[in-house]
Amino acid sequence: MTSQKFYLLGESPSLAEEIDVPPHIDEESLRHLVASYFAIVDPKGIGFVVQDVCLTTVSDIMSSDDAVGITIDGKAVRGVPGPQGLPYIGNYFEVYPDHLGNHQRLFEKYGPLFKTTNMGSVVYHTNDPTLSNIVFGESDFFTKKLIEGHPLYPIKNKEAGVFLGDTDTEEWKTAHKFLPPAFGPKAVRHYAPTMQMTVEDSFKVFDELDERDEAWNVYPYMLKLGSQAVGKLVLGMDFKHFTSVDAPPHEMVMRIAESLSLNKKVTSMGSWYAMLPFGDPKRLRDARWRIADMVNESIERASKGVVNLDLQEAALTAENMVDYCIRATDNKGNKLPRDRIMEPLVVATGAGFTTTSSLLSWLIYGLVVYPGMQERLLQELVDNGFDEGTKIDADLINKLTFLDKYVKETQRKHNPSYQPARTSKVDMILPGGYKLPKDSVVIPAIHHIHNNTELWDNPARFDPDRWDSEKVKTRPNGSYIPFATGPRMCIGFNFALMEVKTFLPKLVYRYRFTLAKDGPIEYDPMFQLIRPNNLYVRAERRVKWPPKTE
């Protein structure tokens, strides 16, 4: 066995590592061998250089008298770039309040990976699908681990398992075994009647607003609508959100929404701020305790069966998630421990309605801002025999192809999710030659991936028909990730899509939506998700519908 010295181009040759190389090794195997020594994530990008000359054969590499430089995708290794920032404050005032616009500016300046520092916390951002796929993969390089600096660190909840817990825990393994069946495609189908009853129950409120000739702010009503369904299906609770026009959101809904806003404020100020015994950090802790108390109370009150059921059968028959969690049994007779039921349900409740209410708001935004969308959606409903009494199910939804494209395009251009971060497990070299230290928090920036001009033709244009194009059908893996991707992607995506694809047809068929207030639509930079703050619309009862397309 012979040996050769290798070093990372961009570093001193004096740091070269001597590596034993087996005889008769081919170039691909040599790349993998070198990658293992230097923690290079993707061996395919490795090249070899001596004195500015690229070496393309193993014999040339092994016969070199000089140490061999390693390039990554033709580049020398380098640190991740980013703005320098101010002492202590870092880049806070370069990022906030318009973090979407400012991050786009930084991507344009620094490229597909950059870092920012806010009040001592360093965070990395990428709009590159290749890097995002690596980051989202639970691997030797990355995992979901909520350390200081992670956007969810102040509300980390080990007992929850999903969303707010680390992957490398028994709690996550247990929750990930029991919860996904309740959110699978078959399980979600049997939630459809409750979802439909929820939106139909809201009609009396929207009808009254129409009779008053009154405009309304979309997000607060979509928050009430989304959470009304989640309250019934997860906790077995009726939040009574549509008993009147001015019915207030249930305390649990307000507390969860408050906690997401407070968490964003706390994380933007750095990890030290989260430890303060007063102010927003204390309010955040108090909100979490109150939410836990209310969920425990709802668990005791929720309608529950008495017979244990197999996971899949329980998912298809349980009245609500409380019922499911108590009765579901795996093939070894194990159940979700009673003391681990409350925390996952808190997460399922909060994540369930905050995401769908934001998405519903953007879907209505599209109806009143982008010409022709509302008319095409309505025509598709009419062409499929839709009327006031139509029962929406998965079979009907599958026929509504324009609805599917409209939802996809809304999730591309106006995706509510913002910070699905992961943490590096080791020092590594990423594609592009970026050196990333261990315990780095990396955020695949979904909004900026979905609006990346290198991935999408004219991404600023809202165009549902792009989803019929060959380019979009053959788009790079990782270029459309509305619910993230990988083992820790959102487990509730089937639920969310079923909900919005049930609510929106019912609303569009009954009402004609128009924009009631001119001016730019603003988002709340201090909320965990991207939602429109000042979208006011009128919803007028339809009195006529178009004829079926001949």
What are these regions (language model features)?
Residues M1-V123, T130, I134, I147-K156, ...:
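N-terminal targeting/anchor module and adjacent flexible "hinge" preceding the catalytic domain
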Residues G74-E94, H99-T194, T198, V218, ...:
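Cytochrome P450 substrate-recognition site 1
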Residues G90-G111, D293, T390-G432:
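Conserved cytochrome P450 K-helix E-x-x-R motif and the immediately C-terminal K′/meander segment
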Residues L146-L152, K156, H190-L360, R376:
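Cytochrome P450 heme-thiolate monooxygenase catalytic core
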Residues A160-G161, K177, P181, V346, ...:
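Cytochrome P450 heme-thiolate "Cys pocket" and heme-binding signature region
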Residues P371-Q374, V442, F493-I530:
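Cytochrome P450 heme-binding "Cys pocket" and the immediately downstream C-terminal segment
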Residues P444-K471:
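Conserved cytochrome P450 K-helix/beta-meander segment immediately N-terminal to the heme-binding cysteine loop
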Residues I530-E550:
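C-terminal helix/juxtamembrane-tail motif
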